[in-house]
Curated annotation (Swiss-Prot):
Residues 1-22 are annotated as: Disordered. Residues 9-22 have a biased composition (Basic and acidic residues). GO terms for cellular component: extracellular region. One of its GO terms (molecular function) is hormone activity. It comes from Canis lupus familiaris. Keywords: Hormone, Secreted. The keyword Membrane does not apply. Belongs to the motilin family. It is found in: Secreted. This is Motilin. The keyword Transcription does not apply. Its main location: secreted.
Length: 22
C-alpha cells in the first residue's frame, strides 16, 4: 500500500468519517 494521501488529507477524511458516524 502506497500512502498517496498526505497527513492533512487523511485528517480531513477521518473527520468526514466521524461526522458520518454521528
Amino acid at each position: 500500500f502506497v500512502p498517496i494521501f498526505t497527513h492533512s488529507e487523511l485528517q480531513k477524511i477521518r473527520e468526514k468519517e466521524r461526522n458520518k458516524g454521528q
